[in-house]
Amino acid sequence: MTKNINQPVAYPIFTFRWLAVHGLAIPTVFFLGGITAMQFIQR
């Protein structure tokens, strides 16, 4: 597979990786932010 690094791919691998990273990172940050907010609300 190392020989095909310079070859253009037929499928948008970078777009798929971007959607995968942001699709998981954004809800995770929002979820952690919500838990942190609830910790201050309870006190």
Curated annotation (Swiss-Prot):
UniProt subcellular location: Plastid, Chloroplast thylakoid membrane
GO biological process, one term: photosynthetic electron transport chain
Primary localisation category: plastid
Keyword Electron transport assigned: yes
Residues that span the membrane, as ranges: 18-34
Binding site for heme: 22
Keywords: Chloroplast, Electron transport, Heme, Iron, Membrane, Metal-binding, Photosynthesis, Photosystem II, Plastid, Thylakoid, Transmembrane, Transmembrane helix, Transport
PROSITE patterns reported in the protein's UniProt record: CYTOCHROME_B559
Role: This b-type cytochrome is tightly associated with the reaction center of photosystem II (PSII). PSII is a light-driven water:plastoquinone oxidoreductase that uses light energy to abstract electrons from H(2)O, generating O(2) and a proton gradient subsequently used for ATP formation. It consists of a core antenna complex that captures photons, and an electron transfer chain that converts photonic excitation into a charge separation.
Family assignment from sequence similarity: Belongs to the PsbE/PsbF family.
Protein name (record): Cytochrome b559 subunit beta
Species of provenance: Thalassiosira pseudonana (Marine diatom)
Gene label: psbF
